[in-house]
């Protein structure tokens, strides 16, 4: 065992002899939160305006070099530079322009970043390109980075688009972390669910299934370096070839068949439309998908009329759209899109669907820009709830960072859902944060957003019914002495079934990595196969000592993390009530269909 990584063992024996009392410090957490600016701060906006000016000049040169007659983004012959600049400023406000002008190579990335990338970074990115790794960054998202010597720390944003050595080394052999995502025709997946052929439906739980459409929804507004579906980009099932991803005539027939799966299943009452990214689908495509979901829900409800009490099937109660575009490209949220969402909610509410979620992914308060604020306000006004999922990368795990993100999102009316530990294998080593740090954050920082039990019903009603939600939430937090609403659960997606943070540390590897024995989350329903599985054993991707060295390298005072060694056991937090399903006005069957054990 490496001596410097075996220090965990020393700390465990030391704690047996000298236990440490952990006393969360509200004033300290507030100071730590104040370190992190948001994309709404005037100083940040000023830097980004300068970024935008630089990027616009790059875009003019890019358009001048393009000779694609099919592109709508071209300059008329003979116009002046000022006219070109005015045209690009106009185009800047449309999502399609940013997708069309996305940066797709290391050389172009360096050009748009003012040649600020190091030789080492360029060499790494060139190696990634040679291995066939896709690059896709929109001008909008690139404008969020800071290439100036002064100003805000953009590490959390930057690490989402810059690849690590480990990711590049392993690309081509990356495997799915979650075994349920490996689908073989005519065979049950790891959770025991029988699924339609293809890769359109993924399922872990009895009550919810994921739908991945054959559309531009198989693309994203950018490629996250820690993407949980990197293996799908590797196989090119997900990609950035928008023309090839446009729905074919056969998709309409396939969609009807996929809807039958939801309609004829006894337990499904929640559909999560994702990808890729659900909002990458064109408006006409998204409208068709939602209409198909609506008609399926109507038929399922109608079929229940002939079923007796105790035999009735689950009816659709929740519809979710998974999208990171609120952070990656909020300009996608147009009046037309908002109209589609509003129209669907009004129709679906009339047939018993009561929960409508945009499940988004802000990683940093720096991603919460004026454009993102406008998109959030528009979606909330359409009657949908916006929930956030965070991936707890190294840069996002710095003291106060996640707390500040919660506070920033709450002020706009976004409620937090999950804080996910980074999953995966060696490919995610660079961004991996040990689970002990996630527990530490929950116990020492998130605790100052813990909603009192007697106030949870009030918060539930507010999120469901009151607008403008952001102002209502800020008032609620102030009245109850909370820094933010800690409605998210810190969890790990297990490689077997479901999410959990219930574990014991049972050993260390020769490299000092903790070996954790996980149990499943007992607060929710699982596939019956769980009774055959028992505990799940996971070797963490990185030792705690290596993680602390990494924090020190990026400027953190590791003394602020000294209690991390205490966190060797975890327990999954209770789910906030807004994430529970409502009760049925009838007795549904307990029988499970599409299941083979």
Give residue spans per PLM region:
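Conserved Radical SAM active-site core
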Residues: 4-6, 161-164, 170-212, 219, ...
């Amino acid at each position: 065992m490496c001596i410097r990584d075996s220090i965990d063992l020393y700390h465990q024996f030391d704690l047996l002899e000298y236990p440490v009392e952990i006393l969360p410090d509200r004033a300290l957490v507030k100071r730590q939160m104040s370190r992190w600016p948001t994309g709404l701060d005037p100083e940040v906006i000023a830097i980004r305006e300068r970024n935008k000016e630089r990027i616009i000049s790059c875009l003019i040169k890019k358009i001048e070099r393009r000779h694609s007659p099919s592109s709508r983004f071209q300059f008329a012959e003979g116009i002046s530079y000022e006219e070109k600049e005015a045209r690009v400023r106009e185009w800047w406000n449309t999502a399609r322009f940013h997708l069309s002008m996305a940066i797709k190579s290391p050389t172009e990335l360096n050009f748009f970043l003012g040649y600020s990338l190091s030789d080492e970074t360029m060499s790494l990115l060139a190696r990634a390109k040679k291995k066939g790794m896709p690059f896709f960054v929109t001008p909008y998202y690139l404008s969020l980075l800071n290439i100036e010597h002064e100003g805000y720390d953009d590490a959390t944003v930057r690490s989402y688009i810059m690849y690590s050595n480990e990711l590049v080394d392993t690309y081509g052999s990356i495997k799915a972390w979650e075994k349920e995502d490996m689908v073989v025709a005519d065979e049950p997946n790891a959770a025991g669910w029988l699924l339609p052929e293809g890769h359109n439906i993924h399922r872990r739980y009895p009550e919810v299934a994921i739908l991945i459409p054959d559309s531009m929804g198989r693309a994203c507004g950018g490629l996250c370096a820690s993407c949980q579906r990197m293996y799908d980009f590797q196989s090119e099932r997900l990609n950035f070839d928008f023309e090839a991803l446009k729905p074919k005539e056969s998709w309409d027939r396939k969609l009807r068949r996929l809807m039958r799966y939801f309609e004829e299943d006894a337990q499904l009452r929640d559909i999560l439309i994702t990808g890729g990214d659900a909002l990458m689908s064109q408006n006409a495509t998204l409208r068709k998908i939602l209409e198909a979901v609506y008609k399926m829900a109507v038929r399922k409800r109608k079929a229940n009329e002939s079923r007796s009490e105790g035999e009735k099937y689950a009816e659709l109660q929740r519809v979710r759209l998974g999208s990171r575009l609120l952070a990656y490209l909020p300009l996608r949220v147009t009046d037309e899109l908002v109209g589609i969402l509003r129209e669907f909610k009004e129709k679906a509410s009339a047939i018993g669907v009561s929960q409508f979620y945009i499940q988004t992914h802000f990683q940093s308060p720096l991603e919460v820009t004026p454009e993102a604020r406008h998109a959030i306000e528009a979606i909330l006004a359409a009657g949908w709830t916006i929930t956030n999922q965070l991936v707890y990368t190294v840069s996002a795990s710095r003291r106060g960072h996640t707390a500040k993100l919660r506070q920033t999102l709450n002020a706009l009316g976004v409620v937090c859902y999950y804080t996910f530990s980074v999953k995966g294998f060696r490919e995610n080593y660079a961004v991996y944060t040990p689970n002990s740090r996630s527990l530490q954050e929950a116990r020492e920082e998130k605790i100052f957003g813990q909603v009192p039990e007697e106030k949870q019903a009030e918060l539930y009603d507010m999120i469901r019914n009151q607008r403008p939600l952001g102002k209502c939430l800020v008032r609620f937090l102030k009245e109850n002495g909370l820094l933010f609403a800690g409605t998210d659960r810190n969890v790990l997606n297990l490689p077997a079934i479901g999410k959990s943070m219930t574990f014991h540390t049972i050993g260390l590897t020769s490299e000092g990595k903790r070996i954790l024995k996980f149990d499943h989350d007992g607060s929710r329903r699982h596939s019956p196969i769980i009774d055959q599985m028992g505990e799940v054993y996971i070797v963490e991707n990185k030792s705690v000592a290596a993680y602390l060295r990494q924090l020190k390298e990026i400027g953190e005072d590791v003394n602020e993390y000294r209690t991390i060694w205490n966190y060797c056991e975890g327990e999954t937090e209770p789910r906030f009530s807004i994430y529970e399903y409502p009760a049925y006005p009838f007795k549904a069957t307990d029988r499970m269909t599409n299941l083979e054990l």
